[in-house]
Design a protein with these regions (language model features):
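A cytosolic small-molecule/anion-sensing beta-strand core signal
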Residues: 35, 64-65, 80-81, 99
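A short, N-terminal "cap"/entry segment at the start of jelly-roll beta-barrel domains
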Residues: 1-36, 71
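Ligand-binding loop in jelly-roll beta-barrel domains
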Residues: 89-110
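Structural motif
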Residues: 38, 67-69, 76, 92, ...
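Short acidic-glycine-tyrosine-enriched beta hairpin
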Residues: 74-89
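Conserved short histidine dyad/triad with adjacent acidic residue
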Residues: 25, 39-55
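Glycine- and acidic-residue-biased ligand/ion/polar-headgroup-sensing regions
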Residues: 57-69
């Protein structure tokens, strides 16, 4: 895994093209992993999602393609391509794909 991550360093990356949709699935690819945080791209097929959970750190989601339904502490937010949403630490949140979408997840541990 470390070699694959190193291959991406010091290069221009088209994040949307780093990952492909897969029918009926959620696909992820970690592009940076450090003790201080991670960058991961995801592709969600329609009808897929991440169930409600909490995280010990803020989770920032940037939509690369499509649109996501992000629920945070019971409030539903529609997040579209080019937009981001910060899911606060300790608050229950989930993601759902009404249509396909791709996202970048930025986790900073602090």
């Amino acid at each position: 895994m470390e070699n694959k991550i190193n291959e991406l360093k010091a290069k221009n990356l088209d994040l949307e093209k780093l990952i492909n949709y897969q029918d009926g699935s959620v696909v992820s690819r970690e592009i940076l992993k450090l003790p201080t945080g991670t960058l991961t791209v995801f592709a969600f097929d329609a009808g897929q999602g991440l169930s409600e959970h909490t995280a010990p750190f803020d989770a920032t989601v940037y939509i690369l393609d499509g649109e996501a339904e992000a629920q945070i502490s019971g409030q539903v937010n529609l997040v579209k391509k080019g937009e981001l949403i910060i899911m606060p630490a300790g608050q229950p949140h989930s993601l759902k794909a009404q249509k396909r979408f791709k996202m970048l997840l930025i986790m900073i541990r602090s």
